[in-house]
Amino acid sequence: RDRSVSRGLGDVYKRQNTGSKSEDVSAAAGETYKLEYTPTLKTYGFTEPVVLKAKPQRVVSLVHTPVLALHEMGIKQVAVPQAAMLEWPADLVKDAKLLNVSMNSNFDIETVIALEPDLVIVGYQSKDTYGKILDREKIPVYYVDAGHVVSYESIKELTDVLIKAFGQHNAGAEAITDRFNKLEARMAEKRQENKGQKVMVLQSAPPRHYIQGKDGTLGSMLNMLGYENVYQNNKMVLIDLEQALSYEPDLLFCVGGSKTAAEHQQVMEEDFAKNPEYWNNIKAIREREVIYLPIKYVATAGINVIDNINELIDIIDAKKLKQNG
């Protein structure tokens, strides 16, 4: 499949006639851009790298994860997915078409083909649907990890691949690497500090409250900060009220669909007030050891995970300061 991709690339460029002089020179010099597959994708059987004959000028991302990294490295995207959990940068959306690729939309891959992309980035689950059609059109496809929860590790792996392929001597790429390195150092420090502290994570749309383990979006962030999750299962389920009384977390984190933390706090406190006999049995609620978070902690969108974790650390630090102050 991948060999046909590099063959097909030539056709794409002939079809578009977009090659500038410098591109022709780099192609003539045999310079290629190689997208290796990440360790995660290799476990799903994607092994052959995607080789591009020239730096892509018309990328379509059907997944959120690569969008910000490509944007910061100056790689032009002609279409990106709509995003509920964050605002894309204004200078990205002024040139890029917003695609509704949510599960239930009747997304038509023909709209992508019409944009004449020179690279399409697709979730690995769509290999047999969108992938087949794009292959037939000889459009290069690169598959990535996708789904409701894309782990920090997975985002970091993909970003490393994109930097290797397109980020040589690139200030944007260097800045991203620097931010990851600073975050890693900060998280290592917090892991020491938070050792032995127990947390519970509720993802709620009252009156429904789901409990999240260490594999959820927020649960995994707290895990990387050294907290122990009281819920040892990795499947998010409706909270068992009886069982929850035995958990005794030091700190409760509440996340949901609200745009701001204050809005989510209001929604949750109204719900707690409907059944105070129950909720006040949980020490963290009784003693206000609760941190409320907005929708951006429900799902990540690529390298904004760096900002989200940094902000989470700041929020927790501010709460500790207030207590000790």
Predicted segments with their positions:
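Proline-aspartate-enriched helix->loop->beta-strand connector
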Residues: 101, 109-122, 241-254
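Extracytoplasmic ligand-binding site segments that recognize negatively charged/polar headgroups
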Residues: 88, 127-131, 144-161, 196-217, ...
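Short helix-initiation/N-cap motifs at beta->coil->alpha
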Residues: 41-46, 96-110, 234-241
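Alpha-helical, coiled-coil/dimerization segments enriched in small aliphatic residues
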Residues: 85-87, 211-237
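Single conserved hydrophobic/aromatic residue that forms the stacking wall/gate
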Residues: 1-13
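Bacterial Sec-exported substrate-binding components of ABC uptake systems
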Residues: 11-65, 169-200, 314-325
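A short, structured surface patch at a secondary-structure boundary
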Residues: 62-115, 119
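Structured C-terminal subdomain patch of bacterial secreted/periplasmic proteins
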Residues: 153-178, 188, 194, 254-325
